[in-house]
Amino acid sequence: MTKTKNTGGALEALVRKRLPDYKAEGLALEQNSPRFAGKVGPRGKAQGRLVSKGGLDFSGHFWGRAVTFDCKSTEGKSFPLNERNVKPHQARRLREAHEMGAIAFFLVEFSELAEGPRYFVLDWPVLAPYWEAVDRARNVGGKAPASIPLDVFKRSCTAIVRDKGGLDLVAVIAGMAEKMEVKR
């Protein structure tokens, strides 16, 4: 059984550690801010609650190309496709961004792996057949994959190595941008 926790909060922190470096190098990724809903109470005090953000964890630009991604973390040897882990609006946003020419992906951590790479870039072309099966099953019935096995990540996704400064996504994003240019 594959368990999920905060689905990526600690991973977000690793990425955030590198944001000042990206900015200093002329690369900027901005984290989406959560939205508040509520009203102004007596004496002008805001009363409200935090509502979930509508987009993905990070968005911005890399050398003139739009980039958007969401951080996910899982225990075990597969990436669950349940709604707790991947919300339909997140997959939709990833697909739409990809179709518009953006670099769009899930940054997935396999938190319990003892050896080998544990961070992978799951881009839309790899995710699409799995997510479309989940979406089809949700809408018209049928069987859908419950998760994407680790072997698929090792075979089809780019691995990222963690260093002292966190996770460096620059080389990965540059490689994805190059591949996209070749396909045009």
Predicted regions and their residues:
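Acidic-basic catalytic patches of nuclease active cores, encompassing PD-(D/E)XK
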Residues: M1-R49, K183-R184
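Short, electropositive alpha-helical surface patch
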Residues: P117-P149
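Basic/aromatic recognition patch in beta-strand/loop cores that engages polyanionic ligands
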Residues: V51-L56, H61, R95
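Mg2+/Mn2+-dependent nuclease catalytic core
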Residues: T74-R93, H98-M100
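Conserved catalytic cores of phosphodiester-cleaving nucleases, focusing on short active-site segments
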Residues: F58-G60, G64-G76
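Nucleic-acid nuclease catalytic cores
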Residues: R95-P129
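Charged phosphate-binding loop/patch that engages nucleotide di/tri-phosphates or the phosphate backbone
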Residues: L150-R184
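Short, solvent-exposed loop/turn segments at secondary-structure junctions
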Residues: F36-V40, G76-F79, L113-E115
